[in-house]
């Protein structure tokens, strides 16, 4: 699935040893010549053509035919089959694969839902070449024989997470379970990872704050710098960075400690020599003959005892391939002093350190224990210290905390449990999954649907209010982490019911009327049928659009599939849902300047991208919603029609009408007034989001299609098709079956 795309703020061009003469002839994007031009590529990347499996491919159905136990058996074989081209530390690739899975999932961030294991983006640039992902290219190559064997039945995203799970289990740790369902992407996401274009540059602003939506503190890191902030070995400052970075990745203090302590129970760091002196280019800049691998090491054997990854060197425990309590006991048993690795990186060793850690390649050699600055932070920070000491004194509690945190880390970006596939899905549900109750009643049929639509239209609610409510409910969906949407009817719960964009007072009255329809239908039935409020919200929007089309002379019927259920307030984490609040929604001409870093137009592209829309879909949706008069706050900006409430192509006709002259409005920035060229009379008002469909050449090209005389009916049908798509974005129960 091509998702999680944000308009490119910085273009990074990586050229594979291309001669200068060729590079000079390389085509450039519009933004190269016109830096202010609008980048619509995020929306074009939703086109299915880039998927080599084709438009009819259903990954969920493929995964259901997979013999998961056979895959796990093959993974276990790979774990202990050391390859000469990249030998396994201690004869076991387990710790290496845990790092691969962790770093694949750990890019997730709560503010925009981007990052995470879904999509298998670790395979692509820039993540493939991030310094924090050094040598993970080899981990994936070790897994290629398994991916090759099972092909379309298991995605890279699923395989990497499953391998991390199997690695943990093979080394004596009991995981909580595993869910498949991560569909692979087929090209790099265009994600804003920070303002700098230099790896390890500080992501903080001039005031030392980490701007939203970022989570990693430095460019090219998954979380924080293990040596300390910007390489300074200050455990107190490191604790502050850890807390902020992990919180932005949906982890609380206890989950953070469990993940670090659990993960650092295994394996070792690699810093046999200076990366600057020994390592070649990252995969994205390596020569063609490297075949996608990077960081070629010219020092010593180039691997094994000479391996260089982070520049830090050593292990946290004396038994790096088994789950033990040693990480925590070592943290408190020793007095740790600052030192440097052979590569010159800051790290810590026990005072009067003894050589107790077996060498990763030579069992006759031993080394001192090691800790990162970020490990010492868990001992010096007061809150982290409380948790680490409690875990040390209660091993079973620590094991369960790590199991839960690991499952959350590797599944957080998958969205609701309805997307989960396989026999190892935990029976327990978690609040971070945005749980939904199961329907314990019969679904409504086509006759009931017709009856309910009629009753909704007879409530006295206007078409506009019904459409606004359905849009407000469904458009919270974001395809970046599959959260939000209408299912659950959480629009009636905190925090959504109070969001300014939803016009709370008006929303309350609409929901009250719909709940009355629901109660009247559900009460005293003998046939076992019921209808949920979430189904009624969508059904009300559909009925209103059909009515608006009828007023314009078109008879349409929008397909509807019941099955949504209603969540409770107890099943809704208010703070977690708060990040879904639209501070800008161009589809409703809403923009909160105080809470946005993107422009209104860029915000529109971002929201359309999260709704998995293409350029034509976004365009026709804007045109329809404008004439249906659904702007937030009742704004008339962009309502370019004399028949508001009728579904027609007037928005495009009037936008492209040359009898109108547009000027900047003196009343508000980002707004415009449209005057009749002959009479000078004010005809329309519009926002920058409206006018971009006449200003931008690519958007205008699509707008011209819908403004044409022969496209009136096409517009109505295209709009309703996209409307249906948005209403069903969260219907994973349908998609997986």
Curated annotation (Swiss-Prot):
There is a cross-link at residues 102-223 (Tryptophyl-tyrosyl-methioninium (Trp-Tyr) (with M-249)). Heme b binds at residue 264. CDD domains: catalase_peroxidase_1, catalase_peroxidase_2. Its EC number is 1.11.1.21. The record marks 99 as: Transition state stabilizer. GO terms for cellular component: cytosol. Keywords: Heme, Hydrogen peroxide, Iron, Metal-binding, Oxidoreductase, Peroxidase, Signal. It catalyses: H2O2 + AH2 = A + 2 H2O; 2 H2O2 = O2 + 2 H2O. GO terms for biological process: cellular response to hydrogen peroxide; hydrogen peroxide catabolic process. Residues 1-23 form the signal peptide. It is an enzyme of class 1 (oxidoreductase). One of its GO terms (molecular function) is heme binding. Formation of the three residue Trp-Tyr-Met cross-link is important for the catalase, but not the peroxidase activity of the enzyme. There is a cross-link at residues 223-249 (Tryptophyl-tyrosyl-methioninium (Tyr-Met) (with W-102)). The active site is at 103 (proton acceptor). InterPro entries: Catalase_peroxidase (IPR000763), Haem_peroxidase (IPR002016), Haem_peroxidase_sf (IPR010255), Peroxidases_AS (IPR019794), Peroxidases_heam-ligand_BS (IPR019793). Binds 1 heme b (iron(II)-protoporphyrin IX) group per dimer. Gene3D superfamilies: 1.10.520.10, Peroxidase, domain 2. PANTHER family: CATALASE-PEROXIDASE, HYDROPEROXIDASE I, BIFUNCTIONAL CATALASE-PEROXIDASE. Bifunctional enzyme with both catalase and broad-spectrum peroxidase activity. This is Catalase-peroxidase.
């Amino acid at each position: 699935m091509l998702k999680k795309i944000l308009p490119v703020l910085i273009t990074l061009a990586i050229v594979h040893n291309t001669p200068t003469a060729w590079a000079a002839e390389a085509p450039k994007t519009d933004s190269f010549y016109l830096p202010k031009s609008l980048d619509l590529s995020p929306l074009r990347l939703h086109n299915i053509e880039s998927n080599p499996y084709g438009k009819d491919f259903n990954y969920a159905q493929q995964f259901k035919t997979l013999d998961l136990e056979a895959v796990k058996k093959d993974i276990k074989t790979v774990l202990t089959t050391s390859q000469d081209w990249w030998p396994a530390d201690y004869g076991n690739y387990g710790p290496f694969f845990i790092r691969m899975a962790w770093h694949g999932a750990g890019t997730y961030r709560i503010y925009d839902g981007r990052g995470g294991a879904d999509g298998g983006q670790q395979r692509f640039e820039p993540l493939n070449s991030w310094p924090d992902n050094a040598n993970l290219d080899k981990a994936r190559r070790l897994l290629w024989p398994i991916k090759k064997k099972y092909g379309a039945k298991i995605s890279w995203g699923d395989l990497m997470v499953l391998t991390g799970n199997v690695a943990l289990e093979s080394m004596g740790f009991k995981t909580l379970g595993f869910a498949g369902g991560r569909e692979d992407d087929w090209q790099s996401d265009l994600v804003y990872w920070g303002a700098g274009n230099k790896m390890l540059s500080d992501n903080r602003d001039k005031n030392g704050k980490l701007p939203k939506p970022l989570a990693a503190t430095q460019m090219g890191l998954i979380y924080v710098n293990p040596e300390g902030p910007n390489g300074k070995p200050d455990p107190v400052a490191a604790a502050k960075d850890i807390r902020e970075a992990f919180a932005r990745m949906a982890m609380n203090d206890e989950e953070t400690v469990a993940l670090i302590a659990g993960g650092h129970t295994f394996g070792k760091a690699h810093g046999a020599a200076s990366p600057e002196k020994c390592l070649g280019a990252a995969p994205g800049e390596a020569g063609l003959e490297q075949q996608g691998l990077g960081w070629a090491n010219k020092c010593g054997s180039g691997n094994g005892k000479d391996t260089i990854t982070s520049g830090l060197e050593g292990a946290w425990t004396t038994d790096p391939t088994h789950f033990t309590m040693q990480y925590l006991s070592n943290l408190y048993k020793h007095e740790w002093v600052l030192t440097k690795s052979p590569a010159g990186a800051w790290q810590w060793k026990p005072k009067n350190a003894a050589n107790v850690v077996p060498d990763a390649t030579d069992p006759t050699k031993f080394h001192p224990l090691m800790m990162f600055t970020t490990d010492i932070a868990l001992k010096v920070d007061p809150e982290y210290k409380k948790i680490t000491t409690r875990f040390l004194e209660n091993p079973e509690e620590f094991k369960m905390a790590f199991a839960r945190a690991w499952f959350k880390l590797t599944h957080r970006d998958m969205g609701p449990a309805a997307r989960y596939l396989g026999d190892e899905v935990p029976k327990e549900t978690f609040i971070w999954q945005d749980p939904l109750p199961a329907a314990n009643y019969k679904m409504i049929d086509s006759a009931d649907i017709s009856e309910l639509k009629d009753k909704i239209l007879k409530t006295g609610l206007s078409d506009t209010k019904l459409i606004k409510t359905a849009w407000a409910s469904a458009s919270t969906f974001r395809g970046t982490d599959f959260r939000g949407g209408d299912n659950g009817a959480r629009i009636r719960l905190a925090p959504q019911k109070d969001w300014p964009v939803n016009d709370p007072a008006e929303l309350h009255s609409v929901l009250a009327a719909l709940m009355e329809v629901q109660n009247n239908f559900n009460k005293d039935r003998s046939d076992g049928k019921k209808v949920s409020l979430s189904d009624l919200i969508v059904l009300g929007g559909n009925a209103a659009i059909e009515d608006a089309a009828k007023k314009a002379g078109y008879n349409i019927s929008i397909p509807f599939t019941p099955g949504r259920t209603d969540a409770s307030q107890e099943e809704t984490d208010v703070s977690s849902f708060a990040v879904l609040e639209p501070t800008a929604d161009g589809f409703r001409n809403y923009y909160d300047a105080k809470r946005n870093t993107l422009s209104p137009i860029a915000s529109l592209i971002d929201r359309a991208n999260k709704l998995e829309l293409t350029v034509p879909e976004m365009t026709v949706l804007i045109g329809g919603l404008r004439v249906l008069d659904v702007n937030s706050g009742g704004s008339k900006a962009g309502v370019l029609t004399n028949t508001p409430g009728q579904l027609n192509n007037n928005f495009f006709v009037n936008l492209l009408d040359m009898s109108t002259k547009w000027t900047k409005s003196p009343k508000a920035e980002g707004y415009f007034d449209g005057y009749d060229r002959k009479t000078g009379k004010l005809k329309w008002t519009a926002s920058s989001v409206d006018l971009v469909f006449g200003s931008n050449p690519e958007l205008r090209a699509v707008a011209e299609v819908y403004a044409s005389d022969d496209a009136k009916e096409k517009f109505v049908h295209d709009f309703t098709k996209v409307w249906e798509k948005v209403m069903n974005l969260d219907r994973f129960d349908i998609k997986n079956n």
